[in-house]
Amino acid sequence: IKIEGFFILYIFIYGDVIMKTTFDEIIEIVLEHEGGYVNDPDDAGGETKYGIAKRWYPDVDIKNLTKEQAKKIYHTDYWRRGKCDEVPPQLRHIYFDMCVNFGRSGAVKVLQQAANSKNRNKIEVDGGLGPATLNAIQKISLDRVRAYRVLRFANIVIDKPNQEKFWLGWFRRALEV
């Protein structure tokens, strides 16, 4: 919003934590969580750097991927395609971070499950971010989404026990965002 030549940035506060609501704010935290180059045989994505996986980006030179290139991929393939700007501001950070971890459809399913646990009118858990989902998530709390995100991580470990080594880091990340 422009007022008398000044731009005002609204910062959303949750408790004593300043909520990040823009791509430029959120991406720095995501890149920090994702870390640098890793080639762990137990990682479903295979070779990764900054969270960009060779499995999903076979034409990208992962080892030599720059931060700026990773940011561009995240902005185009995750933020814009994930419609992050349409999600309520208080949920943008966790939603984008879940898109990185679970893909867009998986992230939306977590939001839909969280909404269904709160709202009387249930929505279909189909992974689509349409009008019904956007309406249903308007007033769900960040803590409710965190709880369903932790559940999703737990189910991954239950289904694939070799992923247990990632559990504690996933759990911490779920609570930090």
What are these regions (language model features)?
Residues K2-I3, F7:
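Polybasic, lysine-rich low-complexity intrinsically disordered segments
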